Design a protein with these regions (language model features):
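Short alpha-helical linear motifs
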Residues: 74, 133-139, 170, 222-229
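Short, hydrophobic secondary-structure boundary micro-motifs
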Residues: 98-103, 126-128, 169-171, 198, ...
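GST-like fold's C-terminal all-alpha helical module
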Residues: 122-209
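Long hydrophobic alpha-helical segments typical of transmembrane helices together
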Residues: 199-234
């Protein structure tokens, strides 16, 4: 049945005239935000296909597009790309004029390193502060592992500001993949009221000014689905 659903999804994709990004709930899906924000902020035109997560039909709906079982998924011509970092690398190759990685080789290596760190690490942050755009003002407990993750994020942002800081406010001066990778962390800190030193505050301020982020937050606010396991704090 999953194979049949996947084949049907492939047929749907081949009829598309532009890239299609399959995402989850905007209130909760941090990985969806990363891919969506990257494409939107870079002014890459795409169709959005939103699937409500954690429902009886979620797995079958996702299986129409990928057998990986997760969102986001980017559908490009004859190619299916899943996993946010793979989508980012593919976008950087497909649209080289968008300069989605820093031009300087050393800065690019740094950007890739901290993007990969976000991709593979920060487990305590994900578990203790799940992305929940509607839960403004909630407080969560801060065990040592979570505090260490928060401190590491602050150190990363502060280091980028010191090394690449500009009036644009992005982590490497101009917008790049890394800004999309850390976008959900900004929204987590916003929800749970994490105080930041000035050295780490430039990037969150810039990100929250983005029209794309404002659109995402407005859409998240209008969603009615509740995923109980993502509801943390008081």
């Amino acid at each position: 049945m999953l194979r049949q659903s996947f084949t049907m999804g492939m047929a749907k994709r081949h009829m598309a005239v532009k890239p299609q990004l399959v995402i989850g709930n905007k209130n909760y899906s941090s990985w969806s935000l990363r891919a969506w924000f990257l494409l939107r902020e870079a002014d890459i035109d795409f169709d959005e296909n939103r699937i409500s997560l954690d429902t009886a039909g979620t797995a079958a709906q996702i299986a129409e597009f990928t057998q990986a079982g997760r969102v986001p998924v980017l559908l490009l011509d004859e190619v299916t790309v899943w996993d946010t970092l793979a989508i980012a690398e593919t976008a950087a190759e497909r649209w080289p004029d968008k300069n989605l990685w820093p031009g300087d080789a050393d800065a690019r290596a740094h950007a890739r390193s901290i993007s990969a760190e976000m991709h593979s690490g920060f487990g305590a942050l994900r578990a203790g502060m799940p992305m929940n755009c509607r839960a403004m003002g909630r407080k969560v407990s801060l065990p040592d592992e979570l505090t260490q993750d928060v401190d590491r994020v602050i150190a990363i942002w502060s280091d980028c500001h010191r090394r690449y800081g500009s009036n644009e406010g992005w982590l490497f001066g101009d917008f790049c993949v890394t800004d999309a990778m850390y976008a959900p962390v900004v929204l987590r800190f916003r929800t749970y009221g994490v105080n930041l030193p000035e050295s780490a505050g430039f990037y969150p301020r810039r990100l929250l000014q983005s029209a794309a982020i404002q659109d995402w937050l407005a859409a998240a606010e209008s969603e009615i689905e509740v995923i109980d396991r993502e509801e943390r704090g008081q």
